[in-house]
Amino acid sequence: MIEKLEYWFSKCSDCLLHPEYTKLLDELYNYELNQEIIDFLCDKATSKKHWCEIRFEHLKILLLNETSFNYDLKQFYFDSLKRCRRLWLKMFYIRGYAFYATEDELLPVMKKFQQQLEKNHDYIDYEYILSEAGLPYLAEKYNYTYLKETLETAKKEYQKIDPLLRGYFTMNEKLEHINLISNEEALKRSKEFLEKHKI
């Protein structure tokens, strides 16, 4: 499997996965992962050469394939979330870290994340963060008070975003992107937003 992964990944671009490579990634969701594949996925999930969306396709397997939790990835997730600048992607590194971390270890990570939520109002970040796979998942699974507080902060800050930029998409429990409005409606809202703000 690793040879196939490496070969077809070499056929991918920085922003687009080759169809054959995508098929291999799909197989990995139900594949018993070994150390070699874990290392491969970790490397690709943090590659600065590729777009966030490409990194996320590899991270999703680590988060959803339960055999990945047979390996100690605590330091990988911690290092990754510290380096990650994109808030929505950081959210999912935190999700991985939470599996290994104690309540006390996760607290400072979430406090800093909460502060970042109060500074950042990129609507794309919030759609991912507030999806059922994001903060709501963490708050329900671990039931820590500070996770619930962070979720409330995210909801409050989301309301500060222009309504024309909210509600375009979400993510389900399988970390799949779900469009909430049609392309026509998205284009209409975008035009209204540009006119409203004279951009």
Named regions from a protein language model:
Residues M1-S10, E32-K44, T67-S80, E103-Q115, ...:
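Amphipathic alpha-helical scaffolding segments comprising HEAT/armadillo-like alpha-solenoid repeats
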Residues I2, C12-L16, N179:
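Extended, charge-rich alpha-helical scaffold/interaction domains
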Residues I2-L5, A133, F169, H197-I199:
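Short, aromatic- and cysteine-enriched interfacial helices/patches
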Residues K4, K48, T67, Q75, ...:
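Helix-centric, low-specificity signal for extended rod-like, repetitive segments
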Residues Y7-C15, D43-W51, D79-L87, F113-Y123, ...:
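Solenoid-like repeat scaffolds
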Residues H18-E32, E53-S68, W88-A101, Y123-K141, ...:
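Structural detector for internal amphipathic alpha-helices that build alpha-solenoid repeat scaffolds
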Residues L147, L151-I199:
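Eukaryotic acidic, Ser/Thr-rich intrinsically disordered low-complexity regions
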